[in-house]
A protein has these predicted regions:
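Exposed beta-strand-loop-beta-strand "reactive/processing" segments of non-cytosolic proteins
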Residues: 108-115, 167-202, 213
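Bacterial N-terminal signal peptides
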Residues: 2-10
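Short, non-transmembrane alpha-helical segments in secretory-pathway proteins
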Residues: 68-77, 81-89, 137-179
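Short, aromatic- and glycine-rich surface loops/edge beta-strands on solvent-exposed regions
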Residues: 84, 115-129
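Aromatic sugar-binding surface patches on proteins
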Residues: 93-109
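Sec-dependent signal peptide cleavage junction
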Residues: 11-26
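Edge beta-strands of extracellular beta-sandwich domains
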Residues: 129-140, 212-213
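Short, surface-exposed binding/anchoring microloops in extracellular/periplasmic proteins
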Residues: 31-84
Length: 215
């Protein structure tokens, strides 16, 4: 009886897998689902809710992702020591920020979830200055969720997604980032294993494609 069960299972498993609805969101290897910002005098702060694969490689292969909070701080110079502290869900986070000479900004990353926050009070110690800033989300009431945004792109670029789908699987990985230039937008990158990328800029409220390019 057990042997008969195994034979039946081996027969039906491919059929079950073939009829399972493909979820393209499963192939998102980098997700920036929230962005909180504040600008004050000579200082600017950006806080990202990020889920990112490790190792972080644009090779068309989706790996396991981890949830992070990434903080970027811009100051008049990078000559001062800099640290950050903040609280999420009653838990305190913080530490020294490293300085990126190329991007000319300080950086801090920690395992914390700010994806659903609308505001985040942050304390920055920059040299002898103590800055108390409150970063606000760039999302609006009508901003699409990342999943809804990807569904909208799939509907608008159905031919492209069909080309990148084989045997009920997406043949690549997806970058999906909430960004802001005066208004919120989404960036989506479709990366295939042959190193090609299809990049899209979309409105955050409707998912309308504003620009696209291939490289």
């Amino acid at each position: 009886m057990f042997l008969l069960f195994l034979v039946a299972l081996s027969f039906f498993s491919p059929l079950i897998q073939a009829t399972k609805k493909l979820d393209y969101f499963d192939y998102v290897s980098e997700l920036r689902s929230n962005l909180l910002t504040v600008n004050e005098k000579d200082y600017s702060l950006r806080v990202y809710a990020v889920e990112k694969e490790y190792p972080y490689v644009a090779d068309g292969i989706k790996r396991e992702t981890t949830l992070r909070t990434e903080i970027y701080f811009t100051a008049p110079t990078g000559d001062e020591s800099c640290s950050v502290t903040f609280t999420v869900d009653g838990k305190n986070y913080g530490g020294e920020m490293s300085y990126d000479n190329v991007k000319a900004e300080y950086f801090y990353s920690v395992s914390a979830d700010v994806s659903k926050l609308e505001r985040l009070p942050v304390e920055i110690v920059y040299g002898k200055d103590v800055l108390r800033l409150t970063a606000l989300t760039v999302k609006k009431a009508n901003t699409l969720s990342p999943r809804a945004l990807l569904d909208a792109l799939k509907d608008n670029e159905r031919e492209t997604f069909n080309q990148l789908t084989e045997d009920n699987a997406f043949v690549g990985e997806i970058y999906l980032r909430l960004i802001c230039e005066d208004e919120p937008y989404y960036y989506v990158g479709l990366i295939t294993k042959d190193g090609k990328m299809r990049a899209y800029l979309l409105t955050a409220d409707t998912g309308k494609v504003l620009a696209k390019r291939e490289s």
